[in-house]
Amino acid sequence: MAKLTVKDVDLKGKKVLVRVDFNVPLKDGVITNDNRITAALPTIKYIIEQGGRAILFSHLGRVKEEADKEGKSLAPVAADLAAKLGQDVVFPGVTRGSKLEEAINALEDGQVLLVENTRFEDVDGKKESKNDEELGKYWASLGDGIFVNDAFGTAHRAHASNVGISANVEKAVAGFLLENEIAYIQEAVETPERPFVAILGGSKVSDKIGVIENLLEKADKVLIGGGMTYTFYKAQGIEIGNSLVEEDKLDVAKDLLEKSNGKLILPVDSKEANAFAGYTEVRDTEGEAVSEGFLGLDIGPKSIAEFDQALTGAKTVVWNGPMGVFENPDFQAGTIGVMDAIVKQPGVKSIIGGGDSAAAAINLGRADKFSWISTGGGASMELLEGKVLPGLAALTEK
């Protein structure tokens, strides 16, 4: 990566501004999944071990008006982080003002402070989300000229707490998590060890058009599963029953198939049910066609076998999107089958592009078998699409 990283700067005695991604799920004030906090620990620990004073920024959820602040404070995150670090985390509970400034100025080397939810600034004219110039300058002024961006999950957004601060400091550098995310995903797409197989699932073709186009150029094979299968089926005149379809994307699907040169591999059968919820019948289709009155909710056993075959010998695999409605045990087999086919390949570099696929790997007990699981759904999608991420572009060149 041609950008400066946290290891390239002297941190001792410095007030170091750090953008982390602590956008964790909360239920009644309790964190239900702390993966993102854990993922940020190496960078935070490095800064404090080097004698820096870490000033952390993160958003949590969406905040548009005063009422939205309810339940969106980072206070539970501060407590969880303190427990993980084994030291106090200063939490002034504000995003600006004398209370924050005094707390920052009182920090000693090796101490950590967490600023309140950056999106609280969105109540006043979306200042965080619209990268308000004054806000970026103000936050930048709280440190000593060094900004560490370790929030891959928001790297595809130009906000005051990433791009805004970057523009107003002497050195904007990547943290370890951001560095790893870029290394794994970008290298997989740009300089993969071959054969390189991409697997794309999920419900909508519209979400993945750019990704499919980019990966058709880069990968040796692109396997398609999930609900978007049926838009590709209908585009070819295959019966899809009541399956999900994007009527306005049929031409796009047809075009992708025509220009794929046989690289695009679709399922050959489905697991169908007579309703999405409250169904009374679940069965495998004979071939591609879905029965009248039924809808496809997972890829079928023949497809699992075909995908297993297509993955044989793969050295690089990027997977984004489940093969079916994996939250329901009746429609998990496709996602499990594909995961198992990926991880059994000898010497494979296997990467999950965040979002639902990451949730599937974690919930179905396969997470530790993958080389890398991305922490950013939208950001990893844009990298897979070949886009430049604003949060990354704003960092200082080496």
UniProtKB/Swiss-Prot annotation:
UniProt-annotated location(s): Cytoplasm
Family: Belongs to the phosphoglycerate kinase family.
Assembly information from the UniProt record: Monomer.
Source organism superkingdom: Bacteria
Pfam family, one: PGK
Lineage, opening ranks: Bacteria, Bacillati, Bacillota, Bacilli, Lactobacillales
Reactions performed catalytically: (2R)-3-phosphoglycerate + ATP = (2R)-3-phospho-glyceroyl phosphate + ADP
One cellular component (GO) term of this entry: cytosol
Residues given in the record as ATP binding sites: 208, 296, 327, 354-357
Entry-linked HAMAP family: Phosphoglyc_kinase
Name of the protein this chain belongs to: Phosphoglycerate kinase
Pathway(s) of this molecule: Carbohydrate degradation; glycolysis; pyruvate from D-glyceraldehyde 3-phosphate: step 2/5
Gene Ontology molecular-function annotations: ADP binding; ATP binding; phosphoglycerate kinase activity
EC number, as in UniProt: 2.7.2.3
GO biological process: gluconeogenesis; glycolytic process
Residues that coordinate or bind substrate: 21-23, 36, 59-62, 119, 157
Keywords, alphabetical: ATP-binding, Cytoplasm, Glycolysis, Kinase, Nucleotide-binding, Transferase
InterPro entries, per the entry: Phosphoglycerate_kinase, Phosphoglycerate_kinase_CS, Phosphoglycerate_kinase_N, Phosphoglycerate_kinase_sf
